Amino acid sequence: MRGWFSSNFKLCLSCIQILIDVARNMSELAAFNERISDLFRLRALQSHLSWDQQTKMPPEGASARGEMMAWLARKHHQSLTDEDLGRIISSLEKQDLSPDDRANVRLMRREYDKASLIPEELVNRMTKASSDAFMAWQEAKSNSDMNSFLPHLRTLVDLTKEKISYLGVESTPYDVLLDDYEVGMGVKDYDPFFSNIRQRLVPLFQAIQSSSTKIPEWPDSVIIPESEQESFCQNVINEIGFDLQAGRVDRAPHPFCSGLWPGDTRLTTRFDETQPFSSIYAAMHEAGHGLYEQGLNQNFAFSPRGQAVSLGVHESQSRFWENMVGRSQSFWDVAQSWYDECFHSKPNYDKSSLYNLVNQVKPSYIRVEADEISYNFHIMLRYEIEKKIFNDNLPVEKIEETWNDLFEDYFGIEVDCASNGCLQDVHWAYAAFGYFPTYTLGNVYAAQLYEAMQEDLGDLNQIISNGDWTPMKTWLNEKIHIHGSLMEPTELIEQATGKKPNSEPFLKYLESKFSQIYQL
């Protein structure tokens, strides 16, 4: 009897210990989830203040706004690098977690390790410098005055180099920045990636420039008021499926999308009364970003698992709607009526003329207004300059000259002013060095997704022509959006398409489309 009691007593103790361990693990997971929720609420506040700075804030608010942003950045950094969070992450890594929880732990480990290497005071200085630089960039761009922006750019480059020094360099300094925007991607990946695209697109671009095919051009004398452009943009945003009950559209010097959470996603665009298609395609681009943000799983909104997986994938969503849909021939089966109804004093172009007009290939100064082929040359130019800045120590004072020289090499024309050159993008004013390559990566992903979508849904041209684009939006919701950051970017693309990411669908798409337009 004593032996029976002893063995059962030990069994009870084991069961109690198991229950204690389960309770401890549950407690740690609950504490972890509470901490990361607070982190992502802080990020939402930062995002909202940044959106306000670019859309609504009066100029005199700049100084105080910079202080607010720096304070929030400090609080965020303190929370992210808290040693208790690191201890909890280490404990959870040893536990048997659900796929969602495991993704959160994996992603937070990456963030915690990186942030812990960077001093809080550097985060503070970078945030304040970026806020000040944005305001200086707006004025410098407006006046086409690179000299007035140089001190701010120099500060941001110096601070970024300081950040790199803390993070450590395994291959090249620029790799540290590239990895911030597309995890795992570095110079060793992008160099052959861009080389392959350049080898295929340069001959195509040159053949088009030599083509005798005449493409309609928008007359310089035709003015389309902002209100009429806004009506067109509203139609296309509605058609894409962007939910205005969970978002809004405003104006900004440089179009962007700000996702506070799936129920509050904010787009911006800009208008030029002499270039109405610029605003249309900016709206489609940002609405593509917006659909991704609205399509994320709300159950994970305040966690890393619930965020967009990468900038490359994010850009695939914007470029899909802007180019694969918006610059297709079928698009004008729907948009012709918007053109006729919204634009009052306009050339009487038919659908075929409008399709050719918006797909005209020619050298252009502005990246966001470039055609689908030369757009990638704009990205390569920026990639080469950033590589020179951080790997070859190109002086900030030489950036404009280097830009202009490379631009002439790529496009065969001289840059006429700084606002059409190195001042045109907002990215460097936010120290977003390493971001640009994700745009071409997004083009590549978009073409691969389009190809897979067509296999699943049938003729996409017919779907676009019909004017009900819900099947395309739903496919992207199910294949991309809802997964958030559950997987790594390349895993997500492979799962969605059945193939590893590769450039071939994108290159074939461009070669086929523009050979037909220009009768090559």
Enumerate the language-model features and the residues they cover:
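Divalent metal-coordination and catalytic microenvironments
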Residues: 32, 168, 285, 318, ...
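Active-site recognition of the HExxH zinc-binding catalytic motif
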Residues: 281-294, 315-319
